[in-house]
């Protein structure tokens, strides 16, 4: 496949390495220094663009790629609140393709399946209270992360006593300051606490606590390699699939 990269930071470099190892060609690399190249012949020749940028840039990047009929794989988060319906319409009515996921790691896809299954079980045991904690790297812009929100929404969909998620305490270990999070948290809210610590790719944990015991499931990333491989697998998936896609389309479990 001919692949364009939108965003050439640490993730972009890792995606490039894995894509080349799997026999693909990188035809264009777009970063903050050359945003105009998204209109270049090289970009337009791509079968798919893999986009990892930020919440403010992502939607505009999708529109640019779609205008050139280039499919998009994206791991950017934080844009869905304002633009989800627009993207759904573009993929349905405009026949465009976006494979979006808050996390492309195969391990997180498996963790997500376990999370959904456990939530269905715990729906019948109201003596257990559920909460979440995530520990991404200190540079992560959104708190909670898109991955944490996706996991929380899966729990809410399967546990009747939870109606919404709320941001709990966010703590930065580097300088010790913290943010108390959302006000007016009730028993119907699933609290997501965040710890910003170091340079690690991320830890996500779901805890079910009762007077008798605690059940915890956790995913810990050792590197960005798992995310990058998943993004390339998603790009390969778009060769024969179109529309609005996500990891549940790619991983059938």
State the predicted function of each range:
Residues 76-98, 109, 114-117:
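Rossmann-fold NAD(P)-binding glycine/threonine-rich loop
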């Amino acid at each position: 496949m001919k692949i364009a990269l939108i965003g050439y930071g640490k993730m972009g470099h890792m995606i490039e390495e894995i894509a080349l190892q799997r026999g693909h060609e990188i035809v264009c690399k777009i970063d903050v220094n050359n945003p105009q190249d998204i209109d270049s012949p090289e970009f337009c020749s791509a079968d798919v663009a893999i986009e990892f940028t930020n919440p403010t840039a992502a939607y505009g990047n999708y529109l640019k790629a779609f205008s050139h009929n280039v499919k998009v794989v994206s791991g950017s988060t934080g844009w869905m609140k304002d633009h989800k319906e627009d993207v759904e319409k573009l993929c349905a009515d405009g026949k465009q393709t976006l494979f979006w996921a808050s996390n492309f790691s195969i391990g997180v896809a498996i963790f997500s399946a376990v999370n959904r299954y456990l939530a269905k079980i715990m729906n019948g045991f109201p003596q257990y209270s559920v909460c979440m904690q995530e520990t991404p790297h200190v540079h992560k812009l959104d708190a909670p992360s898109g991955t944490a929100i996706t996991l929380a929404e899966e729990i809410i969909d399967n546990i009747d006593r939870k109606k919404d998620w709320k941001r709990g305490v966010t703590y930065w270990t580097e300088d010790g300051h913290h943010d108390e999070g959302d006000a007016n948290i009730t028993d119907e809210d699933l609290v997501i606490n965040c710890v910003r610590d170091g340079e690690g790719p991320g830890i996500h944990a779901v805890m079910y606590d009762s007077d008798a015991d605690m059940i915890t499931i956790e995913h810990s990333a050792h590197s960005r390699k798992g995310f990058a491989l998943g993004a390339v697998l998603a790009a390969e998936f778009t060769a024969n699939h179109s529309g609005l896609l996500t990891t549940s389309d790619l991983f059938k479990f």
